[in-house]
């Protein structure tokens, strides 16, 4: 199975990056073909709502930025993992842009499983991101394989590593 992990934290050595790396290791150990992309390091603009993609573009976005690298990866992925820090109640902007740019293709062609990894230093801030994630799963018609959250002292622990491995086992 091809697994695509979109990591949305600008902090290269932060908790979200660690969670994404643990997911990659667990998925590779399970025999999956894994691609990990730090979308926070990419130049991906938000959707312009210009509708070029649904007219002359025939499914292609008019914007020629780093999202062009992600479209083929999304098209080939069987499973998609979103790894994101929660700064203020919802998915971080760095991950919002690539998700919303999928508008031009409507839904990823092969993705049938999804998972969400979230980190935060504040308790009680995950509900908005969880609701958005569940909406994406429902709209795309994909199986929700689970959510792993890690706050404060839960970050970068063996317990969190095991929760991520258990989530990957659902792929």
What are these regions (language model features)?
Residues 106-147:
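Short, glycine-/small-residue-rich phosphate/pyrophosphate-handling segment
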Residues 8, 39, 118-121, 149-150:
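Cofactor-binding loop segments of dinucleotide-utilizing enzymes, especially the Rossmann-like FAD-
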Residues 1-83, 89-104, 154-171:
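N-terminal beta1-alpha1-beta2 submodule of the flavodoxin-like/Rossmannoid cofactor-binding fold
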């Amino acid at each position: 199975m091809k697994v695509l992990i979109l990591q949305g934290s600008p902090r290269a050595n932060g908790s979200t990056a660690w969670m994404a790396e643990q997911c990659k290791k667990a998925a590779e150990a399970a025999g999956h073909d894994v691609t990990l992309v730090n979308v926070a390091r990419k130049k991906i603009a938000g959707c312009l709502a210009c509708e070029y993609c649904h007219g002359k573009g025939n499914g292609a976005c008019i914007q020629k930025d780093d999202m062009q690298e992600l479209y083929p990866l999304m098209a080939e992925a069987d499973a998609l993992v979103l790894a994101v820090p929660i700064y203020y109640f919802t998915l971080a902007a760095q991950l919002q842009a690539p998700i919303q740019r999928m508008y031009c293709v409507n839904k990823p062609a092969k993705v049938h499983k999804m998972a969400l990894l979230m980190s935060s230093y504040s308790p009680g801030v995950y509900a908005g991101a969880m609701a958005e994630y569940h909406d994406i799963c429902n709209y795309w018609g994909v199986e929700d394989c689970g959510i792993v959250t890690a706050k404060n002292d839960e970050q970068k622990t063996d317990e969190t590593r095991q929760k991520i491995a258990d989530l990957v086992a659902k792929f």
